[in-house]
Curated annotation (Swiss-Prot):
GO terms for biological process: intracellular protein transmembrane transport; protein targeting; protein transport; protein transport by the Sec complex. The gene is secD. The keyword Transmembrane applies. Residues 127-200 are annotated as: Disordered. It is found in: Cell membrane. Pfam families: Sec_GG, SecD_SecF_C, SecDF_P1_head. This is Protein translocase subunit SecD. Residues 135-154, 161-194 have a biased composition (Pro residues). InterPro entries: SecD, SecD/SecF_arch_bac, SecD/SecF_CS, SecD_SecF_C, SecD_SecF_C_bact, SecDF_P1_head. The keyword Cell membrane applies.
Amino acid sequence: MASSSAPVHPARYLSVFLVMLIGIYLLVFFTGDKHTAPKLGIDLQGGTRVTLTARTPDGSAPSREALAQAQQIISARVNGLGVSGSEVVVDGDNLVITVPGNDGSEARNLGQTARLYIRPVLNSMPAQPAAEEPQPAPSAEPQPPGQPAAPPPAQSGAPASPQPGAQPRPYPQDPAPSPNPTSPASPPPAPPAEAPATDPRKDLAERIAQEKKLRQSTNQYMQMVALQFQATRCESDDILAGNDDPKLPLVTCSTDHKTAYLLAPSIISGDQIQNATSGMDQRGIGYVVDLQFKGPAANIWADYTAAHIGTQTAFTLDSQVVSAPQIQEAIPGGRTQISGGDPPFTAATARQLANVLKYGSLPLSFEPSEAQTVSATLGLSSLRAGMIAGAIGLLLVLVYSLLYYRVLGLLTALSLVASGSMVFAILVLLGRYINYTLDLAGIAGLIIGIGTTADSFVVFFERIKDEIREGRSFRSAVPRGWARARKTIVSGNAVTFLAAAVLYFLAIGQVKGFAFTLGLTTILDLVVVFLVTWPLVYLASKSSLLAKPAYNGLGAVQQVARERRAMARTGRG
């Protein structure tokens, strides 16, 4: 037990808490999106639903194992800590993602395949606006019917160089069949009742295969043709996205649509990344993604950068160039950075990229649908009911404290206000930085946290009563009571926190949110009791006014102490 005669500096404790509270609210008002309210879960606010349709390079149906793995990875991306309130479910060959709020782009980005490769840059050229479809020029020599005027490069053994302003095709379109002039005329076949249905998967697989044939050719002349052509369609969606072969060269565009690149085969892939984090660059003027490679990749990167100083190296994500910096020096240690293009990374985009790289690439590529709004399953009425329940619980605690402890009950109220202020600010920051959303289960955890905080006050005040029963004054009973109570308070909160931790790690769904808020309020209860309640009660014990039983509610206890002393004197007499 700590000595009750040790010097106490309550102003220091209160100052520490005020500095913490001010610092947290500065973060709330001056960082991030500056939204000053906690994010609400799907059950209270509604959300956005996006369906991701799996696509495979060969057009086959995705396997159950691949879909389950993709579901697990996307769940980790959107709900890494289990407190975002998002849902990822398998629906046939699709994954359905539901996230709180109305940001459909965020939900679609979760389906990003996130296949990262580091490729040396062989050539590049500025992107050019796509020219309108050229009209066929008159020719002195007639073309055979049904034959295209200029064979496309992808199918020509010695393709002609593309003319300036012309827009070559990446692959030929099947010409319409024409009648053979040498064959006798025959009646046209009867038109079918219905056009044969095409398989979208097979059609997409053919388009991907033709893109690979054009943009991943090993022929140098074909590479230059593909580079010139790709420069005219950087603004278009990339059919190849996430399906390029890392062992072959690649012609692609940057994510800012300003440059087309010819890239060599990959030297390092994303599965060789050990960790990815986001933060400010060394100059403090922009955001970057820091990568840490695994052992073999770290050696490869160190050797490569040492041997290729002055050359350009591209970081491709899902077949597009995210960053293409010039190597200035050898980079040992297995670490490197990815900086954004134009526009540069924001805190949100850098964090999102680091998140998808950290949890790995998907085994499948997905095509997202349009975002759909999902209505709240419970709605604001449930939120209002939860808040009313919390207010009633708080009011009962305050009434009990005022009736039983008088002025000390006011100190309880101040401590609860301090705790609530800190909880609110932390919930705002958690929603901003780890995507925490407050649902009905989380509100239940907060309400139980009020009871935990009140329990700490009761333990402290009852220990003070015990000291007064033993004959001590209110002034001397407070430090001695605190020395005895704090161990009990820490032990009780430790048990509650342990229960919350077990729930958090073993449960799924909304139970995680309940356990998270319960654990959070338990930790903050200790902070408030040590930095606010104890110093305030100590200051109150120095007041001659509050030492009066009419104000501190300890008259009955002091009467018991007087009776004990009288009995002791009678026994000695």
